[in-house]
Design a protein with these regions (language model features):
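Oxidoreductase and adenylate-handling cofactor-binding alpha/beta cores
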Residues: 107-126, 167-174, 314-327
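N-terminal Rossmann-fold NAD(P) dinucleotide-binding loop
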Residues: 162-163
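Glycine-rich Rossmann-fold phosphate-binding loop(s) that bind the pyrophosphate
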Residues: 158-159
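Rossmann-like adenosine-cofactor binding region
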Residues: 183-288
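Adenosine-phosphate binding glycine-rich loop
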Residues: 283-284, 292-314
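An N-terminal-biased, well-structured beta-alpha scaffold segment characteristic
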Residues: 1-99
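A short, charged, Gly/Pro-tolerant segment at domain boundaries
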Residues: 127-137, 328-339
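Phosphate-binding beta-alpha-beta segment of Rossmann-like dinucleotide-binding domains, i.e.
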Residues: 93, 99-152
Length: 339
């Protein structure tokens, strides 16, 4: 009986030894190499040449000729927008994402920010920094909260993350609207999929964006960045958005037109925003977002998961088993749609 040939797995990440050892133990056919790298030039040519599975965030070979054995790329990101136009986008190998690890922490982050905006947290933080107790009149006029119960939240991108946000928002008594590319289910199998239905949301399509926005007291952006979604929330969209709405963006900066958002905030049409993602990252020191009134800001951390290593091991191990058995992989990136 012929022994199956070994498959070389290369990680450019920084998983602990116990993680790598467990992957080896589960899949003895796998030859596991980890070389933490910031650029492809830090990986020796002989390693590239024998790599069959590449697990990486943003370190890719210069060309297909560098990786003649490559058969699959496992991304350490939920999105694939950073790959379009790169050397690997057109390679005839499957791309898989790490989607499914972050829906719960991201949904909890969104609810935290919805509550923070509703309870005027940006202004409250300003009061704390000023170090002076405001008068009752000032508190009444500037720190009066909104209620989430009975308000409407619109979620742009009603997939795994959006559905979990919708589920939690429903528990707060909010009416939930979801906007998604199609009313059907995306083809393929996905890691961590638990919400089989739309969690009671009223669904819209992108063609109905302005009607959707007109109903939103709160707008949450969770969709992937693609050619279709880039600049989707622009000046025209803010014009259609319900007066005084608040925005939370946990997706990608390029989906929301930052100039249009700034105009909306300063005019009062947008009553507040919570931003975890930006056009330019890292956000430069001195950028107006750091001190923009009415804005809560975090440095792209909404998707951080305390059990990231354990969840990633389960996803990667499942996909390795599928790959070795010739089965369909989880979280396949649809290149036609860009995610």
């Amino acid at each position: 009986m012929t022994t199956p040939a070994p498959v070389h797995y290369l990680s450019t990440l920084s998983f602990p030894d116990r993680w790598l050892d467990e992957l080896r133990a589960r899949h003895p056919r796998l030859v596991v190499t980890q070389l933490r790298a910031a650029s492809p030039d830090e990986i020796p040519g002989e390693v590239w040449r024998r790599t069959g599975i590449l697990h990486t965030g943003n370190v890719f070979p210069h060309s297909a000729a560098d990786v003649p054995q490559l058969r699959w790329i496992q991304l350490d990101t939920s999105g694939a927008d950073h790959l379009k136009g790169s050397s690997v986008w057109d390679l005839p190998v499957p791309l898989t994402s790490i989607g499914g690890i972050s829906p719960v922490p991201m949904a909890e982050y969104v609810m935290m920010m919805l509550l923070g905006l509703a309870h005027r947290l940006p202004r409250a933080v300003g009061v704390q920094r000023a170090g002076e107790w405001p008068s009752l009149e000032e508190r009444w006029n500037t720190l009066m909260p909104r209620r989430l119960r009975g308000s409407t939240v619109g979620i742009v991108g009603y997939g795994r993350i959006g559905k979990e946000i919708g589920r939690l928002a429903g528990q707060f008594g909010m009416d939930v609207l979801g906007l998604k590319r199609g009313r059907g289910t995306r083809a393929g199998e996905f890691f961590g999929s638990t919400a089989a239905d739309d969690a009671g949301a009223e669904l819209y399509t992108p063609a109905e964006l302005h009607a959707f926005l007109a109903r939103c007291d709160y707008l949450v952006v969770t969709c992937p960045l693609t050619d279709e979604t880039r600049g989707m929330i622009d000046a025209e969209a803010f014009g259609a958005l319900k007066e005084g709405a608040m925005l939370v963006n946990v997706s990608r900066g390029g989906i929301v037109d930052e100039d249009a958002l700034t105009t909306g905030l300063r005019s009062g049409r947008v009553a507040g925003a919570a931003l975890d993602v930006f056009d330019e990252e890292p956000l430069p020191s001195g950028h107006h977002w750091w001190d923009e009134p009415g804005v809560l800001l975090t440095p792209h951390v909404a998707g951080f998961a305390p059990d990231y290593e354990e969840q990633t091991l389960e996803l990667v191990s499942d996909n390795v088993g599928r790959f070795l058995a010739g089965r369909d992989l989880l979280n396949l990136v649809d290149r036609a749609h860009g995610y």
